[in-house]
Amino acid sequence: MTAPASNITADKNAFFGADLAAADRDIFDRIGLELNRQQNQIELIASENIVSRAVLEAQGSILTNKYAEGYPGKRYYGGCEYVDEIETIAIERAKALFGAGFANVQPHSGSQANQSVFMALLQPGDTFLGMDLAAGGHLTHGSPANQSGKWFKPVSYTVRQQDQLIDYDAVEEVAQASKPKLIIAGGSAYSRQIDFARFRQIADSVGAYLMVDMAHFAGLVAGGVFPSPIPHAHVVTTTTHKTLRGPRGGMVLTNDEAIIKKVNSAVFPGLQGGPLEHVIAAKAVAFGEALQPAFKAYAQAVIDNARALAEALQTQGVNIVSGGTDSHLMLVDLRPKGVTGRDAEHSLERAHMTCNKNGVPFDTASFAVTSGIRLGTPAGTTRGFGAAEFTRVGQLIGEVVNGLAANGVDGNGAVEAKVREEVLALTARFPIYN
């Protein structure tokens, strides 16, 4: 039985005309709650940031309708004229931003960017060398729980116990002993600058490719306040959010034409099908923002604020891994306080400061508990916090942690309530999306 035309017209009008509030109240309400959380909590998770309305608008655009398997000018679908132009803009902006010869902006995430390099340059069972997860590496750098640790043969390097810094001589010793085909520099919880030239020297000495995962510090590189790996690495991977302040996604950069051809084939058709062109458009917008002079000031402020936060924590008797930071993030070692990372994360969240529990070098606690927390300044800097605000944030974190040490998990409610009131006053001074 054919539906009456009037019903079809009504359904069509509702489909194209109803906003989210009218169409799906369950989701609309929960997005509103999440907006309230972001507005009224201080975001200290080092891998998170706050994007512009322009980035949100691009990602929420009608480009979500378009399938575009392949690459600009070489698609497997018709109707790709405009998404070709958008993806080309994203590629050219990425190349200009990082001074790279080639870019692939299609990876859906940093993990898939890393996977694409593995697929492009390694065979299953090949040996590669990466930073141990407990020392600040990443799951995709050889964790046995990750594909990288299941399909390939990972060997790891760590940090020195006395200062928690990379020991490059030790890295070279491991490389000479294991003869990896690929060496990875970069990680998810290492706060110091990395000597990329030394890593390249080590890679060359054993005939290995050097891959730098700059997911965490890409925005600092783009802003000119952190050393660039592009002149030294055979290939560089990154996310496009974190310090780069774009949508959640990944990217691969290189100056080697042979490598980009292999990476392109690995991304599509090797790992992915159709690219997310609405996300690629948002990446292009974020890259355009990062090419503006204001972004350099932002990147410098991120580092200045991180140093202010670390110094404030240290004055509260809180231990910072490696003694400080050169970047946007820091690891807090809570073992001297007798506090776990899990308890600190939960207590700080009740005080409206969001961070994540994190293992510290040579940690004996489980990943579910940990002995530390990881803190970062990108999101707070985006909302306008300066060194004075982050100094106060450090003092407030110290109050919560010291309260936990003195009062225990169940006795810290009064401290959390006091800190929460000050946090709410602080976030009210620096509103977002208002």
Curated annotation (Swiss-Prot):
InterPro entries: PyrdxlP-dep_Trfase, PyrdxlP-dep_Trfase_major, PyrdxlP-dep_Trfase_small, Ser_HO-MeTrfase, Ser_HO-MeTrfase-like, Ser_HO-MeTrfase_PLP_BS, SHMT-like_dom
Pathway recorded for this protein: One-carbon metabolism; tetrahydrofolate interconversion; Amino-acid biosynthesis; glycine biosynthesis; glycine from L-serine: step 1/1
One annotated GO biological process: tetrahydrofolate interconversion
EC number(s) given by UniProt: 2.1.2.1
Keyword check for Transferase: yes
Keyword Transferase: yes
Keywords: Amino-acid biosynthesis, Cytoplasm, One-carbon metabolism, Pyridoxal phosphate, Transferase
Modified residues (N6-(pyridoxal phosphate)lysine): K242
Residues that bind (6S)-5,6,7,8-tetrahydrofolate: L133, G137, H138, L139
Subcellular location: Cytoplasm
Cellular component GO terms held in the UniProt record: cytosol
Gene Ontology molecular function, alphabetical: glycine hydroxymethyltransferase activity; pyridoxal phosphate binding
Family classification: Belongs to the SHMT family.
Descriptive protein name: Serine hydroxymethyltransferase
